[in-house]
From Swiss-Prot:
Keywords: NADP, Oxidoreductase. GO terms for molecular function: oxidoreductase activity. NADP(+) binds at residues 25, 45, 71, 98, 162, 166, 195, 197. Gene3D superfamilies: NAD(P)-binding Rossmann-like Domain (3.40.50.720). InterPro entries: NAD(P)-bd_dom_sf, Sc_DH/Rdtase_CS, SDR_fam. Pfam families: adh_short_C2. Coiled coil: none annotated. Belongs to the short-chain dehydrogenases/reductases (SDR) family. Hydroxynaphthalene reductase-like protein; part of the Pks2 gene cluster that mediates the formation of infectious structures (appressoria), enabling these fungi to kill insects faster. The product of the Pks2 gene cluster is different from the one of Pks1 and has still not been identified. The lineage of its organism: Eukaryota, Fungi, Dikarya, Ascomycota, Pezizomycotina. This is Hydroxynaphthalene reductase-like protein Arp2. Its EC number is 1.1.-.-. It is an enzyme of class 1 (oxidoreductase). The active site is at residues 147-148, 162, 166.
């Protein structure tokens, strides 16, 4: 597991906005940024209580945080999210677009509603989050988008919708990095493999050879850990630590990249 050594407060004075930060990977990212001294805007869509719990956890690290409700699939809500963040903290230095959803369906069964739900959150929302970040970030800021190992993975059935929604984000990343360069803003994407979250609990069996619904979680973890040289499945803290590096001034020469976060897993 990730170690618990004391973390230097290398992001003191920075302000970060993390979408979907009330749980899962987003929570892990928000906490790691806060441990390093950043003030954090914890965005959530519907579950206020978990988001406020993240704010409370951040306060225990000595950093500041605020929870702001916004449905990021709606552009006016994205605009309001950024305006409220700026009113609360005065400026923004780091924006992490994390929210996402996953659907596994045979191609012939995918409906327009399925398509719109996945692409509205995984793809369209990330475009407009990045657009607003570009406008509002101070010079030298950081944008981190969320792709997935699925964007370049073959051999997984019923996966076209999710894989396609994440592949588009990788194209955004490379183009945005060019467009944002004059403000010295870097734009990167991370592409995690399996990470222990509620989405993992619901869908990870699809990635296990001969996996089936209702598999015990211990079997799923063991099956996926077998692909990883480190012998385990990722936890949100693992992802948060990489994002914390990308948010740091030392990461400036990492730009326009998609960073695969799988612990070396080969599938």
């Amino acid at each position: 597991m990730a170690s618990s050594e004391e973390t230097p407060r290398s992001l003191t004075g920075k302000v970060a906005l993390v979408t979907g930060a009330g749980r899962g990977i987003g929570k892990g990212i928000a906490l790691e940024l806060a441990k390093r001294g950043a003030s954090v805007v914890v965005n959530y869509n519907s579950a206020e209580k978990p988001a406020q719990e993240v704010v409370d956890e951040i306060a225990k690290t000595g950093s500041r945080a605020v929870a702001i409700k916004a449905d990021i699939t709606k552009v006016p809500e994205v605009s309001r999210l950024f305006q409220e963040a700026l009113r609360h903290f005065g400026h923004l230095d780091i924006v992490v677009s994390n929210s996402g959803t996953e659907v596994f369906k045979p191609e012939e069964e995918v409906t327009e509603e399925d398509y719109d739900r996945v692409f509205n959150l995984n793809t369209r929302a990330q475009f407009f989050i990045a657009q607003h970040a570009y406008v509002h970030l101070r010079n030298g800021g950081r944008i981190v988008l969320m792709s997935s190992v699925a964007a370049n993975m073959s051999g997984i059935p019923n996966h076209a919708l999710y894989a396609g929604s994440k592949a588009a984000v990788e194209g955004f990343t490379r183009s945005f990095a060019v467009d944002a360069g004059h403000k010295k803003i870097t734009v990167n994407a991370i592409a995690p493999g399996g990470v222990k979250t509620d989405m993992y609990d619901a869908n990870a069996w699809h990635y296990v050879p001969n996996g089936k619904p209702g598999m015990p979680m211990e079997e799923i973890d063991k099956g996926l850990a077998a692909f990883c040289p480190l012998g385990r499945v990722a936890v949100p803290q693992d992802i948060g630590r990489v994002v914390a590096f990308l948010a740091h001034p030392d990461s400036e020469w990492v730009n326009g990249q998609v960073i695969l976060l799988t612990g070396g897993s080969v599938t």
